[in-house]
Amino acid sequence: MPLSHGQKPTACLALADGTIFYGKGFGATGETQAELCFNTAMTGYQEIMTDPSYAGQIVTFTFPHVGNVGVNPEDDETADPVADGMVVKWDPTEPSNWRSAGELSDWLASRGRIAIGGVDTRRLTRAIRQQGAPHAALAHDPEGNFDIAAMVARARAFPGLVGKDLARDVTCAQSYRWDEMRWAWPQGYARQENARHKVVAIDYGAKRNILRCLASAGCDVTVLPASATAEEILAHDPAGVFLSNGPGDPAATGAYAVPMIREVLEKRADLPVFGICLGHQMLALALGATTVKMNHGHHGANHPVKDIETGKVEITSMNHGFAVDSQTLPAGVMETHVSLFDGSNCGIRMTDRPVFSVQYHPEASPGPQDSFYLFERFVASMDAA
């Protein structure tokens, strides 16, 4: 909750333009610098903080109640939080949920992540929207000692995400097989037994629930690092290739990912390829399009997207700060989905091959499940190959 009169702040958020927000710190102590974004999801704070796509960002939650259902080991999208920090309106209360295994503050502290509560998140969200994902410094000091001028200077010195290949920081170190399926009551996460197609997933920062959706759809998934070569991928003789989500500037990651994708497409003309988020941007770059940095990005679980081919609207989960420039799509590549918020590109496909991708997250986690059909479409394309 907001600081009471005379209460000394124990956390401070300093924006690069000199705007200062004080509040109550929780989680780890110390300071971090990152790009600020806001997320409009009402649930799923644990999944959001552990989504590798948030590397290099401090997440502002527009929903005021964060932490009230605690944390648990099943909802992590990767082993540890990846987002650099958390900003909330109300500091977390004692959790109340049958799945809770601990408190948010303790979970953040044990993983070295700083958080601030008691912030006017409506005011901050407007600032993010108007300034365009500003850089910021977030500090937590139980004694409340902050060098504001130095924090602002460090926020201004943060290099930003443009030109940053963050996929290398969050990808797996070596290949592994994935057979865990989506969570279901009462058994939890079951193991896959009857796979239909061998799929190679390129890990640019893959969320666990994307891999679970692939396994649940009947894919025998082998995950390879972001640096995998076309030769290494094709050595697995896959029925399909999946390009995962991830953080950072797609143009930077594309320095090594784009040549690999092009070589795979050249050597296996019949190979189905499916991309999500950064994987969507990697595919677009490989096909000849370009990407651009967005003003404040799309982060939330309530983003309407129109399927141009069917006219249907899907409510989707999104997390990206870069977008494909649809005006640069070459012949033979069509735009399939657009955002109803700003008209930005949300999907493409090749017109003569089973190759397609979307900017949003069909696996949700958190978010709506309107777009699960895309995993089925990927499997159907392998059935037909």
Task: Tell where the protein language model's regions lie, with residue ranges.
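Short, flexible hinge/linker loops that cap or flank conserved catalytic cores
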Residues: 191-195, 267, 349
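Active-site-proximal beta-strand elements of phosphoester/diester hydrolases
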Residues: 198-202, 316-317, 356-360
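RNA-binding accessory domains that recognize and position tRNA/RNA substrates
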Residues: 1-236, 365-367, 377-385
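Catalytic beta-strand/loop cores that center a nucleophilic Ser/Cys/Thr
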Residues: 311-353
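Residue-level structural signal for beta-strand termini and adjacent loop
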Residues: 25-26, 64, 319, 350, ...
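Proline-centered loop/turn at the N-terminus of a beta-strand
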Residues: 114, 198, 270-274, 290, ...
